Amino acid sequence: MQCIETNNLQQLLEQVKPYTKKGKLATYIPELGNANPNDLGIAIFHKETEYIHAGNSQTLFTLQSISKVITLALALLDRGEEYVFSKVGMEPTGDPFNSIIKLETTSSSKPLNPMINAGALAITSMLAGNDNEEKMERILQFVRDITDNPTISYSSKVATSELETAYLNRSLCYYMKQNGIIDNDIEELMDLYTRQCAIEVNCIDLARIGLIFAMDGYDPYKKKQIIPKHITKICKTFMVTCGMYNESGEFAIRVGIPAKSGVAGGIFGCVKGEMGIGIFGPALDANGNSIAGFKILELLSAQEGWSMF
């Protein structure tokens, strides 16, 4: 597969930049409302030629729902498939990512998948550790290993902002606790979950995460397996079916690669055996995905023949 050049990335960014005007910030999390809606950046991390980047590619932003892929991988390492999927399902949903509807209407009362908020909260509740500090350090160290960036941390301001306004997520937790899906202290779980979502990265970090998943968990630069292959396979399957909220089907048709988005404007994707892509564009569409980020991935996929279908 031919390597993309930096000037090509810059041209594509300029081409899709007008789309940022059509999106909106995720103001329901107050700190995210302070982002610049015109920001747009991209990085591509290739298995052989390291990375190229353009635009606001070194601006820090929080993972938000992208962290769900990280914690799913950790939970599978900690607990194994049988336990994890006894508590969380494997099916996509047409409901909003923060909806409680399916919890109430499915006979098992378990979340449909790990990429919706209820499922992600259940996954976080499974992580090993004596307390939240130990669990959070494990999550951070996992992200540092994948990104090869030892400075990765989280934004306490964003975490606090989310914790103070997470009324719906608390209700999801209480409902799941009532039905035996989780048994954690709710406030402790919410504290850990909001900190996990507030982990800060830039596009280059995100592209490197994408590369590791593209290589089935293998780091071609460190020459070692970071995540077991079977776990990356599970994670990437969920990224295809559920990774882009209620646009996952359209994204599969228009772009055709495993990807996960977050409401801070991040998207990471992976082209199997080749490269990872990291994008930041905080102006979101109606489904909570970066509106310009979606478009640039659509153009790149068409140009480079990325689709897996």
Swiss-Prot record:
Pfam families: Glutaminase. Its EC number is 3.5.1.2. Homotetramer. Keywords: Hydrolase. One of its GO terms (biological process) is glutamate biosynthetic process. Substrate binds at residues 65, 117, 162, 169, 193, 245, 263. Belongs to the glutaminase family. This is Glutaminase. InterPro entries: Beta-lactam/transpept-like (IPR012338), Glutaminase (IPR015868). One of its GO terms (molecular function) is glutaminase activity. It catalyses: L-glutamine + H2O = L-glutamate + NH4(+).
